[in-house]
Every structure is written in C-alpha cells, then in structure tokens.
Amino acid sequence: VAPKTSQILSDQADFVVVGSGAAGSAAARWLAASGASVMVLEEGQWPEPAGPDLRTALDKLYRDGGMAVAEGPDSIVLLQGRCVGGSTVVAMGVHSPLPEEAWQHWCALEPRWKTRLPFQELDQAREQMDELQSVIKTPTSLQGAAGQLMRQAFPGRADPTWRGVHACRGAGQCLLGCPNKAMGSADRSLLADAKQFGAQVLHGCKAQKVLIREGTAHGVEARLDDGRLAHVLARRAVFLCAGAIQSSWLLLRSGIRPTGHGFQLQPLMVLAGRSNLTTKAHAGSPVTSHALRPFGAELFASVLPERARGSYLPGIGLELEERLQHIADIATWNLVIRPTARGEVRDRFGRPQLHYGLTPDDRQRCLLALSAACEGMLRGGASEVYPQLRRGPPVVSSAGDLERLRAVPSEPAQLPLRAIHFFGGLHVDDRFQVPGVRGLVLGDSAAFPSAIGVGPLSAITAYATAVTQRWVA
C-alpha cells in the first residue's frame, strides 16, 4: 500500500514490543510494571467474537484467513492469530507446563541454557503467570463428549487440562473467539494489565524491520493500516515477540541472517468420531491424555464449532447427509506430534515463507499415533471414527478397519496436517539478544532451541516473563 503522505510518523518509548500475543503481552506487562514507557506494535485489530460463522472468524482473527501453508512435501496448514492478543484469542487457553525433559533437550543442544535460564527460574515464572492469569483445572462438568470418550478410552491416563479462563461456560467456540468473553486471552489479561501500568498499544501497525545503527537496535519501522510509515524508537531495547515465524522473518527483513538449530513446528492431526454418549459434543472444554507419549504424541479432547466438525465427515450424497444429521454426536480429538524435522523461514516477496518437511520417522509416528487414537476412540464408545487420511480407510469401525489403517504407508501428504505451535530454534546471547545486535531481544518461542511436545502457551509466557524481569531487575 502506498503511503498517503511522504511524512514519516515518529514516536518513542523506553521499550518497543513487536507483537501482542502470549509473549508480547507478558513482556509489555512486566516492562510497564517496572515504570518504563512501553509501546506495543500489533498488526491486527482489537478482536470481537465472530459468532458462529467460521469464515468470518478466519478472515478477522487469523493470519492469511487461516490458509497459509508451509512449503514442502507435507503441505502443513499454518494457523496463526492476527489480532490484538494474537493466537491466544483463538486458542483454547490450555496452559501445559514446560516438561523438564524438553528443557534438558535445550541444554543438550546448547549447554549455555543451563545457566542462561535454569529450569527452576523458568518454572517459578510459570507459577507467577498461572496466578496472574487465573489458571484453573477444567471441571468435570465442562469436559463434554470428547473428554468423556477420552476418559473411557484411557482410564487413569486422561486428565483435565489447566486453562486460563474466567467463568467458562463450555460454549465450544474457542477457535472463533469466545462469545461469552470468558477466555483469559492476552488482550483481556496481560495486555490489559500492561495498559493499566501505562503501556500503549498501536494496533493496525505492521512492523517491517528493526532499525539498527552501529550494532544497536534503536527502533522499529512499521506501516500503518492507512499506508503511512512510522518509526517507533526505543531508548533501551526492542523486544521481538511476534511469534516464531514473524520474528524470524523480521530479522531477515532487517538485514540479519540469524543462526540457530533450524525451525520446528508441532504437526497437529484432527480425529473425529461419532459418539454414542448422551453427552453432546457441541460444548465442553479440553481434556488431555499422555497415553500416546511412546509415539512422541500428546492427545487432546477438543471442542470445535459445528461447521468445523462437519468438515471432518467422509462420504458424499446420502451417506454424508446421514452423518450430518448426527453432527451433535461428532466428537473430535487433536493429536500433536513432537517432530525431529527442521526447516527455515525465508523472505518471499516481502512476506514470510516457511519451508518445512517431516522426516520419514516423523510421518511414521504420526500414523502410529493416529492408529492408537482411533483404537482408543472406539474403545471409549465411538461407533465409527474418521481418520482423515488421503489414502486409507475413510471410516474405522472394526478390528479389520484398524488393521487396514495400520498398513497405510507413511508417504508425504498422506495426512492433512495443521500446525499451531512454532519454535524458531534461533541463537540468543546470555541477555537473550540476537548475537551481534545490542538491544534486540528475542522474547518469544523464536528463541526456543526445539519443540517441547506440549502446547507452548505456558512456556512462552514464562520465558517472556523471565527474560523481561532480567532486563528490568
């Protein structure tokens, strides 16, 4: 978009934070609480619940309308929030603690993490953030049909999730923006606190590059929605908290070729099944199971809007119509795989492009975990299960179907994969700065050396808190 005027707008603060999601809101909260002046730059707008319309939610709340795809053999759909509050607005608010084993893997990759950010310090930051965000265990009354199926499928190995919510009613519309405004998303919690402490939020303000002079970051160049250019200057530091993909891309746009271990994402598969339970599937809150950890997988009972659940039903004509008549009985589970594959973010015509492909072992574990989940869903009380394979049985309802499912080859693009968890694998120094650039802090999961195997919301806010508190101590 061409600017309406050649004038460059200018403003300044002690700290400039790029991004208002989990990391940006946590960083802004602690920076502002210290008495520093803070400006938060957010590309999107303040969110409003989209109601029941899935297309409207995708257009208003998601980057690229939820249609971005990683370049590579697996065609993984990349789901990222693009609004004030970032992906926290359209997530389920699940706060899974960072496993110590994942932190130990970071230390194996980079021994400096042992002293750079000890696990105890990170876990204390998590406890602090859990208290601030009113993180509570999901009550049984809100666990819905998908959760009940999971508890019956994996007795003793399915647990309520810990969530940051306020009086959740189990509306089942988390992915569209909670219609009851019960989600403790960043815009309603940490960012609201930051504003009370004096932070300013500039929405509709897309960061284009970091301004660097003599090896020091001194601000951000951004484009406003009306086309005008803005220079937002930082007296002390710039915090990149735009998400692992966007933060990695901003470094490239700023003339920095970052080093690291390579980008990772956690592939997500959705498994749908027809429940025979009296509890309906249109409402509820997530439940999680660790039963699939031998495959490097986490299993979550999720609640999706009706239209989204309908998209997972197989068949055409009368067969599909019959299944749609039972849409209230369709329960969904999410499987998240911790991968070994690495990729990279590139700049493509002024936009980020993720290049990523799973390893053969990753694909095989995806299929093994999917088969185990299908078997579990049938055991839990589903009459038929829909595994979503491109070449494989569309419906699984018997032992024979399970055998055919296990025999499916682990080829690229066999599974319709999505990703909502991203990890940049980029190097930082002991002040969490980009090496060689003073005052440019990586405050989000772009700095995580590897995937962590669980949803990263809690780990991201804890990391941003620990990093920020080091800067204002």
Label each region the model flagged:
Residues 30-33, 37, 44-49, 83, ...:
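Glycine-rich loop(s) and the adjacent beta-strand/alpha-helix scaffold that form part
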Residues 15-40:
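N-terminal Rossmann-like FAD-binding beta1-loop-alpha1 element of flavoenzymes
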Residues 172-236:
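Helical element adjacent to the flavin cofactor pocket in flavoenzyme catalytic cores
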Residues 36, 43-101, 145-150:
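N-terminal FAD cofactor-binding segment of flavoenzymes
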Residues 84, 88-170, 357, 361:
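Rossmann-like flavin
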Residues 167-174, 209-213, 382-451, 457:
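A glycine-rich dinucleotide-binding beta-alpha-beta segment and adjacent secondary-structure elements
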Residues 1-15, 33-34, 72:
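Extreme N-terminal leader/targeting segments of oxidoreductases
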Residues 91, 256-377, 410-422, 435, ...:
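FAD cofactor-binding and catalytic pocket of flavoenzymes
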